[in-house]
């Protein structure tokens, strides 16, 4: 199929959306979605077209791949003040294969950037991989990145990754296929340079289930939340890791984005984004590790508060909790380490370190270690180590160290304390 055409320009209203890509013919690849039209003065931007779906598989061939979402949602024109970026198109789904491997899902398009006071557009989601009757499942498409804001505005959210396709069972005369890989989540867009929040990272796609006798694939890692560049803005949260296919490990959670630094002497700094949770493991698979919390922004002169460290993501079932983020300079507290997930031995995350004291201000208290996960099968998880207290500056005192996390209960043996 041919690519979709760009949307027509609006006269008094919003710009048109990009056309969708045509679906592929039998055994053929589809067209990509067209780009959204750019916004003119005082108009909003068009949304990027969606990618076409893959064509049906031929008698012995694999299905066509999903088309990519439009490369960019439209960007606000330089003469426009309040124009938001267009959203990226979604990737098409890969076709299921009767004989051969499932086709890959298309990638999501990136969100467009905002104009002077516009927010960024959201990234498109990745398409799902096709399932296989006699072969491997297709990979999920990658989520598109969120668009960045102008001077004032929020960043666009990152798109989610597509899920991997299911592999075939080893039936007589058939090939046992592995599951497709989950697509990565898209990165969140940056907040405005003066004010605005950074956006959340996209969720990682789930790993595909493997055919009988094969392990499923590992879930994809959640994307990192983007930092905010403006005053009082908060960092985006990390995307959640994808769930593992049967027998496959869960994907790791994305890290939290950095908190924004206040530009005025009296404004407060933004807090860190939290780390994404680790994906749960498939049956027999290990849970993914939680993402670490980001570091809190430092305080400015004349006592604006430092941002608190982001919370570590929880471990997926059986996975380790992510570490808490460190507090910014002048911060009161480091973040608490995340609790380890229940499982065979989920360990608690490490507490974040307390921030350094500002002039004549005491150091921050270290975050508490996460609790170990409780197990019904074997030993409980260990508690996480407490964070270090922050050092005092000038004539100020240092911060206290964080408490260790409690050990998880075991079926027969209790876990050790932090």
Predicted features by range, described:
Residues 1-418:
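Collagen triple-helix signature
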């Amino acid at each position: 199929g041919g690519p979709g055409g760009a949307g027509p320009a609006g006269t008094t209203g919003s710009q048109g959306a990009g056309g969708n890509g045509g679906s592929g013919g039998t055994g053929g690849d589809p067209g990509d979605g067209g780009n959204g039209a750019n916004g003119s003065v005082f108009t909003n931007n068009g949304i990027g077209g969606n990618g076409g779906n893959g064509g049906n598989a031929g008698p012995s061939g694999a299905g066509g791949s999903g088309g990519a979402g439009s490369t960019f949602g439209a960007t606000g024109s330089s003469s426009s003040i309040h124009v938001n970026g267009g959203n990226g198109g979604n990737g098409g789904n890969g076709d299921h294969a009767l004989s051969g491997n499932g086709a890959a899902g298309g990638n999501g398009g990136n969100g467009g950037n905002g104009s002077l006071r516009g927010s960024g557009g959201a990234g498109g989601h990745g398409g799902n991989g096709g399932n296989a009757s006699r072969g491997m499942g297709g990979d999920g498409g990658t989520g598109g990145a969120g668009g960045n804001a102008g001077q004032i505005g929020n960043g666009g959210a990152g798109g989610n990754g597509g899920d991997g396709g299911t592999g075939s069972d080893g039936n007589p005369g058939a090939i046992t296929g592995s599951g497709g890989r989950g697509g990565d989540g898209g990165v969140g867009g940056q907040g405005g340079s003066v004010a605005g929040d950074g956006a959340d990272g996209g969720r990682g796609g789930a790993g595909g289930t493997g055919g009988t006798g094969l392990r499923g694939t590992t879930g994809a890692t959640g994307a990192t939340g983007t930092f905010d560049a403006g005053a009082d803005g908060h960092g985006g949260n990390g995307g959640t890791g994808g769930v593992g296919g049967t027998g496959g490990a869960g994907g790791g959670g994305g890290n939290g984005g950095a908190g924004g630094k206040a530009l005025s002497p009296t404004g407060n700094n933004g807090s860190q984004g939290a780390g994404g949770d680790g994906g749960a493991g498939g049956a027999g698979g290990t849970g993914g590790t939680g993402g670490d919390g980001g570091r809190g922004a430092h305080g400015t002169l004349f006592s604006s508060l430092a941002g608190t460290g982001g919370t570590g993501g929880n471990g997926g079932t059986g996975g380790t909790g992510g570490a808490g983020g460190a507090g910014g300079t002048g911060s009161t507290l480091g973040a608490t380490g995340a609790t380890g997930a229940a499982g065979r031995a989920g360990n608690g995350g490490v507490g974040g370190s307390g921030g350094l004291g500002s002039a004549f201000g005491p150091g921050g208290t270290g975050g508490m270690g996460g609790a170990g996960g409780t197990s019904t099968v074997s030993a409980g998880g260990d508690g996480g180590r407490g964070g270090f207290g922050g050092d005092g500056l000038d004539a100020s005192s240092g911060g206290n160290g964080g408490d260790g996390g409690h050990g998880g209960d075991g079926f027969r043996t209790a876990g050790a304390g932090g």
